[in-house]
């Protein structure tokens, strides 16, 4: 019994210390980016020896993988579970929440989607999250089909990619400030409206068959 209590206390201390380390790493990353974060610098901020921090994280990459997981949990928590009365608003809600995430958690959005230096920190958790979100979005598309707002043969995968691009691009513009004159909040609304118009008009239908490969006439072949 005593051994179990000691083990639980040690585990609790270990987890708390890991969270504190991640908080320090997150702060350093927010201020000056991926290159500014080193295991030695984080250890110094924590009052550790340079070697002691490796007990909690074996590498900088592992530390950022844990930070990326935190960002994913925040993003998933922001993904809607509710259903709105209007099917179009209901469809767009996950994409609007994704765009809002870029503004409420810009450092995590940058880490997850924009920072090439931190790209190695991403992996299966990110893929699994996207898969869960995709299943939810497909259900929202099917509701629009059932209610006669979109044609039955709409290509849901392509349509979903269009909506994602409509929010991701303005999110990046908002975070980078480039181009400086652009107004991402206005752009995202215009792009979403344009995508919905394309869906309603039947411009994003499933192909009847795979495009045939073009071949040159026999006389034109070398």
Residue ranges and their predicted role:
Residues 119, 132-159, 174-180, 202-208, ...:
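Hydrophobic alpha-helical bundle segments that form small-molecule/ligand-binding pockets
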Residues 2, 16, 20, 24, ...:
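Helix-turn-helix
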Residues 80-108, 156-163, 208-218:
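Hydrophobic alpha-helical connector segments
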Residues 103-121, 172-178:
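Amphipathic alpha-helical segments used for helix-helix packing
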Residues 80, 122-147, 157-165, 189, ...:
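Amphipathic alpha-helical packing segments from all-alpha helical-bundle domains
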Residues 63-71, 112:
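Alpha-helical DNA-contacting segments of helix-turn-helix folds
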Residues 1-16, 176, 206-222:
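N-terminal intrinsically disordered/low-complexity leader segments
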Residues 21-29, 71, 75, 98, ...:
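Short hydrophobic clusters on alpha-helical segments that form packing/core surfaces
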């Amino acid at each position: 019994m005593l051994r179990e209590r000691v083990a639980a206390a040690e585990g609790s201390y270990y987890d708390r210390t890991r969270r504190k380390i991640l908080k320090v790493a997150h702060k350093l990353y927010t201020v000056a980016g991926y290159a500014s974060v080193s295991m030695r610098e984080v250890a110094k901020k924590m009052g550790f020896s340079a070697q002691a921090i490796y007990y909690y994280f074996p590498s900088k990459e592992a530390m950022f993988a844990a930070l990326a997981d935190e960002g994913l949990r925040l993003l998933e928590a922001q993904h809607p579970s509710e259903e709105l009365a209007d099917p179009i608003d209901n469809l767009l809600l996950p994409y609007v929440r994704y765009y809002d995430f870029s503004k409420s958690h810009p450092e995590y959005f940058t880490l997850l989607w924009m920072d090439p230096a931190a790209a190695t920190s991403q992996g299966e958790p990110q893929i699994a999250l996207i898969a869960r979100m995709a299943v939810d979005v497909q259900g929202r598309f099917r509701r629009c089909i059932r209610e006669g707002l979109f044609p039955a043969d709409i290509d849901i995968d392509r349509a979903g990619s269009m909506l994602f691009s409509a929010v991701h691009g303005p999110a990046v513009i908002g975070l980078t400030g480039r181009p400086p004159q652009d107004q991402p909040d206005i752009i995202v609304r215009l792009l979403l409206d344009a995508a919905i118009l394309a869906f309603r008009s039947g411009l994003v239908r499933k192909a009847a068959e795979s495009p045939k490969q073009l071949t040159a006439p026999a006389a034109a072949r070398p």
